[in-house]
């Protein structure tokens, strides 16, 4: 697979303490009690999280140049970026140069045509436009050194049934597999509010039917809060998750709101634990409102605390 290798978190083991003055356990410090007749072992600090912290390119101030935006992302603590599909070849080259200059990786591509031109459409012309957009996204990914392209696979609506969305989209995605394999780019299926793949079991089944390492999941933490639990999705999809989007969601009496990380209903401690259990070591990319340096630095610190478990 082209996505980064999974690294297991370090598991620390603690042996029973010896009597006062008798030896210490490896990896822990032995402290004598006030009676000097027993000892207590200090718990080693958790190992650093292997998850890479990122954000979508559109969160950065548009008034800045490509290089300035990417340097800002790096300066406030982000390691990777997700960039949008860029059909203009010159602009795509400039994005690459800017990322190199800023020493930040364009980790993945946000495909831009799947909502306007869904692969599940019954209109062949619409589907071809969608396929063309994905091909551009895959080539962008290769140019930028990315390893995944996000894809919304289908849209269920009055014209497209759930069954048709399933079969049509799989048929079209299979047409993209040879290119994805050639370029070694994962097509990462995201769960969104498209009335499709409404449970982690369905999503796992849908992806599993491709029987290809080049089709994996892009899991969005905030998107499932209305009807599910992110930690459940993470455990169910497990090693099939290639990338992650970070959002937070808050229920309100008069509806709902997308809010900053930690200000909504996501149980971040449970999410963090689920990532640990599954050994997730990919990217966690913020998909939030944009803002200035002060705001972005605050978002970066929230990721440190809520997702990476750093104080």
What name fits each language-model region?
Residues 83-99, 153-160:
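Glycine-rich, proline-tolerant flexible connector loops at the mouths of alpha/beta enzymes
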Residues 44-56, 108-119, 156:
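N-terminal small/glycine-rich loop or linker at the start of catalytic domains
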Residues 78, 141, 146, 241, ...:
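A structural motif
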Residues 90-103, 133-143, 229-239, 273:
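Short amphipathic alpha-helices and their capping/turn segments at secondary-structure boundaries
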Residues 13-23, 27, 120-219, 226, ...:
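Active-site acidic/histidine proton-transfer and metal-coordination neighborhood
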């Amino acid at each position: 697979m082209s996505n980064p290798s999974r690294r297991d978190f370090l598991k620390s083991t603690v042996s029973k303490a010896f009597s006062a003055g008798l030896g210490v356990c490896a990896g822990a410090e032995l402290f004598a009690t006030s009676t000097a007749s027993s000892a207590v072992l200090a718990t080693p600090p958790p190992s650093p999280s292997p998850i890479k912290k990122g954000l979508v390119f559109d969160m950065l101030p548009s008034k800045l140049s490509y290089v300035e935006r990417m340097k800002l992302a790096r300066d406030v603590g982000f390691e990777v970026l997700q960039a949008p599909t860029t059909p203009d070849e010159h602009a795509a080259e400039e994005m690459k140069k800017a990322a190199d200059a800023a020493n930040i990786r364009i980790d993945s591509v946000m495909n831009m045509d799947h909502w306007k031109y869904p692969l599940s459409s019954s209109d062949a012309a619409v589907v071809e436009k969608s396929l063309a957009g994905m091909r551009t996204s895959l080539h962008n990914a290769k140019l930028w050194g990315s390893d995944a392209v996000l894809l919304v696979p289908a849209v269920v609506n009055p014209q497209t049934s759930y069954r048709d969305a399933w079969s049509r989209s799989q048929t079209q995605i299979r047409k993209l597999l040879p290119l994805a394999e050639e370029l070694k780019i994962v097509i990462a299926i995201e769960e969104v509010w498209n009335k499709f793949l409404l449970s982690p079991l369905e999503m796992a089944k849908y992806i599993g039917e491709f029987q290809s390492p080049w089709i994996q999941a892009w899991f969005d933490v905030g998107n499932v809060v209305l009807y599910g639990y992110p930690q459940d999705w993470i455990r169910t999809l497990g090693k099939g998750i290639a990338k992650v989007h970070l959002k937070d969601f808050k229920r309100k009496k008069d509806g709902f709101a997308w809010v900053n990380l930690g200000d909504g209903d996501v149980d971040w401690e449970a999410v963090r634990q689920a990532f640990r259990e599954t050994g997730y070591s990919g990217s966690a990319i913020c998909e939030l409102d944009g803002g200035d340096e002060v705001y972005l630095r605050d978002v970066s610190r929230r990721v440190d605390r809520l997702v990476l478990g750093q104080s």
